[in-house]
Structures are given as C-alpha cells and as structure tokens.
C-alpha cells in the first residue's frame, strides 16, 4: 500500500458519555474501582470535581483514575455547594444521586448551563419524595434537601433529553424500593442502552420492557474496573474528514461491540458514498479519491443527534441537498444547534431551510467566513472538517473544543498535513 491507500490511524480520546457514567456508578458502588483510559477534558474534569464536592475520593492512577465508592448516596452535615461548570451531565446525573443521600446540596454552573432546562428532572425527583427547588426558569441553581428516595412508578417527559432518565436510572439501585419509569417521547435511545449496560456492569438489576418502560431493582452497586472506549461522537469528525479528503481513517478500539450509538454515524457516511468497514477491532472510513459526496437523501439522526452537525457541516460538498430530521432536541444543547448550523452555513454562502426538528442543506461553493462557535465544542469541530476542503474558514473560539477533545486541532493537523485547517487554530 502507498501513503494514500494506507489508512491513517486516529488517536481518539475516551468516551465522555462512558467516562461520566462510570465515574458516578463507581462513586455509588461499594469498594474501589479503577477507571482506565478515561476522557480527560473540561467536561469530565468538571464532573470529577463535582463528585469530590459530594465527598467522593478520586485519585490519579497510572492508567486513569481510582474511585473509592461509598455504596450509597452522599451524606453531608452542612449545606454543600456542587460546581457543575459547563457539564450538563453533572447537572442532570448528580442531583438524583445526591437525593439518595442525606443533607442539603446546591448545584450550580456556568451561565450557559443555567440556560439549559431541568424542569422534567426537578418534577421527577419531587414525585419520588425529594425536596427540590430550582431557578425561576426551571434550571440551575438547583437545591436538593436529601433524605433518600422512595422509588415507585414514574412518568417522565424525555422529549428534551435522555439525560434526565439516565440520572434517575443510575440512582435507582440506591432507592428504597424498585423504580419503574415510563419514558415519554424518548430521544437518543442508544444512550439509555449504554446506561443500562454500564449499570449492569456494576451489578445493578434492570429490566427494559421494550416500550419505553424500564424497571430497576434496589440493591446497590459493586465496584468493577472498566476501560473506556474511544468517543464515537468525537470520532465522527475524523471519519467525516476521511470522506471529504479521499483518505482512509481507522479508529481502533471503536468497533462492532461498542456501547455507543453514535458509531451509527459511520453508516450515515456510507450513504454519502464513503466506504465503511466496522470490525470488532475498530472502524475505518475511506472517502472517494476525489472526496466527492452523494446527497439527495433524508436521514433521521434523532438517536445520534450529537453527530448531526458533522454531517450538516460537510453537506455543502454533496451533489444534492441533504435533509436531517428528528433532531428537535438539539435546540436545547450547548446552543440551539439547528439555528447555529443554519447561521454559520449562511455566512459561508450556503442555502438552508429549517423546521422545528429538521434542517435541509443545499450544495454550493463556500466563501470565507468566521464561524460563530457559541462556546459549543461540536460546532467548532464540525466546521473544522469542512475547513479541510473550504478555504478561508476561521473559528471565533477554537479553544472551546477543550470541553471534550483538547487535542482536536493538533490531531486534525497530524492526520491531514496536506490540507489547510481553519485559521485561528
């Protein structure tokens, strides 16, 4: 094989979703857990710090982090402040865990995090016996006066995010009796599958009834070591880069046995004409030699919405429009991601149409523009991929990638030294 046909080997850090779930499950377990190859980024460090605010002992180890779990919810004698920074997972996963303990906990975060909705979680915790209050907009700051959670039956609006359900499920083994949740209009279902798999790894008993109803039995968790696989959402950027540059890129360790639904993005790339190979050892995407993309299709990315911007950013390079739908909940992430994508594509001279849960991107030549990142790491990374093919792209906040992949820009330059990466990096 020559240089152009030998796949490039991408260095993708550990999954944020797995890292933060495993941190919490280890903290709730009885005993010591070694978490190997965790993602080390702003979001996971914020989650780790929030757990230490709750009294959990976490120390650095050669291969990752050691967590000493207490086998129960946290107990404090005085009001305890918990800093979530920008980490939405901390704001949504940790209050249910705290509610299974004893004491008063006050959760707060950045202005960006204060703008993200928490009302469904607050209402659910109240229904389970917790005393909870939040800001006037149904968001942070959130106060939990904890005295354990009862469990029982619960209907949960899951149309904004699957993270409310995830937080409640992970706390359920610490409740006084079984929890049965009926998730209404559940989005991002693969993240719930991931959560249940990790809960079972740590010894929980959970039954998925297959109709949006899940029952979790009390009984706690037991410590269990875990190695974190590469982040599939992050991998979407280098796999898309392979498609638009005509190269092959392999992500080792992210294969057919992955816990992450976002690996499904590779199959979306297959619809654009890229060659995709998924084995147990890893995933390889190879673009057409000229980097051309086939459009003219619509795709539901509701279950893998963290990757929709990756497709949207490269869609102008296709030969026909591409419509992405089922992503209405992406309007409530770090930014209104549908609107942010549309505005940035318009700045580049690309025509789009959007609806409440969809966006259509038309092909076209892009002009120079500064991308508005809105402090959203995924906007910066997605449009950086387009920048490999489209000259004159700059980012107004290139450092925001530190939320999940601090080394992103360096890795993109390493993989594609013959292509221009966006200026300002």
Each language-model region and where it sits:
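Short, structured segments at the rim of ligand-binding sites
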Residues: 1-425
